[in-house]
Amino acid sequence: MRFWLAFFVSLFVVCAPAAAKSKKKNEFKDPRDKQTYRTVKVAGLEWMGDNLNYKTAGSFCYKDEDDQCMVYGRLYTWDAAKKACPAGFRLPTHADFESLWTAAGADFNAGYLLKADYGWSGDTNGNDTLKFSAMPAGNRFDDETYGNMAKFAFFWSGDDSSEGVAPGNARVWYLTSKSMAFGYMSKPKNFGFSVRCVR
């Protein structure tokens, strides 16, 4: 009896640190405000699996309600987004998002693999195969109003000088409740959109 007790105690001691290490491996704790984010590896890049929620100038909660930030993260102007990621992470480039799109199948159903499996209006949730868990956080307009909650997820890229990007705009990748596509557009830099940091 004492042998088996000693065996199980030894097994627990050996296995427990490994379990803790595994848990931390897929998480990142922001030293600036102690918030923890899931991380996922896709196509050789490590993405945050949650929208950034670091409070800084030029960032907002949907409809200025703090509770929304706890679910959807903050909405950032492009200038704020460029500076918001913690050390070691950065705002994704257009090429980074293209790699994500390719990993999701590079077709009109890519959004199905990227969307969270809850929260989207209508019957348009994803299956979250890649664990990117895109949430429909909506956006802040330049007149300080808000819209598109449950209908759109917008993510800033770091590109503002690419072909097809108008002066004063930057490239935004988006998912919509209208389809399972994952695409991009050009939007004014003073709009508020979500941020996913990458490294």
Language-model-derived ranges and their functions:
Residues 21-199:
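Conserved positions within compact, well-structured domain cores
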Residues 6-14:
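Bacterial N-terminal signal peptides
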Residues 1-4:
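Positively charged n-region of N-terminal signal peptides that target proteins for export
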Residues 15-20:
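Sec/Tat signal peptide C-region and signal peptidase I cleavage site
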